[in-house]
From Swiss-Prot:
Pathway: Aromatic compound metabolism; 3,4-dihydroxybenzoate biosynthesis; 3,4-dihydroxybenzoate from 3-dehydroquinate: step 1/2. Belongs to the type-II 3-dehydroquinase family. Its EC number is 4.2.1.10. It comes from Debaryomyces hansenii (strain ATCC 36239 / CBS 767 / BCRC 21394 / JCM 1990 / NBRC 0083 / IGC 2968) (Yeast). The gene is DQD1. One of its GO terms (molecular function) is 3-dehydroquinate dehydratase activity. Homododecamer. Adopts a ring-like structure, composed of an arrangement of two hexameric rings stacked on top of one another. It is an enzyme of class 4 (lyase). The record marks R19 as: Transition state stabilizer. Is involved in the catabolism of quinate. Allows the utilization of quinate as carbon source via the beta-ketoadipate pathway. It catalyses: 3-dehydroquinate = 3-dehydroshikimate + H2O. This is Catabolic 3-dehydroquinase. The active site is at Y24, H102. Keywords: Lyase, Quinate metabolism. SUPFAM superfamilies: Type II 3-dehydroquinate dehydratase (SSF52304).
Length: 144
């Protein structure tokens, strides 16, 4: 069983709860992070959480994860999903299995959201399940 998981949230996810609630709901990022920590703890695992709006800081945190012995990464890269070769390369460099998460169904949204730079290297992609996608990703990772 996986003992160390890192949950990364990218740009604008710090605004969950107030940002376009018709798309993203009213659950805050703090609520998601607290639930994630509790879910992992209930299974005897450790959950670290991180959010940043800046691409380079996200890349740095992914590199740190390797040094810290993180065994699984869960990432909602937000808009960087569709633009960031740097985040893709960082995930490939550390070779930590990861799950890509999106609250909305990105395939039913604007065309530019249909391309992910992460999906083809992810263990799984979860989208369109609302914030439950985080719960599902954690459950999957904990049972690896």
């Amino acid at each position: 069983m996986v003992k160390k998981i890192l949950l990364i949230n990218g740009p604008n996810l710090n605004s969950l709860g107030t940002r376009e609630p018709e798309k993203y709901g009213t659950t805050t990022l703090k609520d998601i992070e607290q639930a994630a920590i509790e879910q992992a703890k209930a299974k005897g695992s450790e959950m670290a959480v991180y959010q940043n709006n800046t691409e380079g800081f996200i890349v740095d945190r992914i590199h740190e994860a390797k040094k810290q012995g993180v065994e699984y990464i869960l990432i909602n890269a937000g808009a960087y999903t569709h633009t960031s070769v740097a985040i893709r390369d960082a995930l490939s460099a550390v070779a930590i299995p990861f799950i890509e998460i999106h609250i909305t169904n990105v395939h039913s949204r604007e065309e530019f959201r249909h391309k992910s730079y992460l999906s083809d290297t992810a263990v799984a992609v979860i989208c369109g399940l609302g914030v439950y996608g985080y719960t599902a990703a954690i459950d999957f990772a904990l049972n690896k």
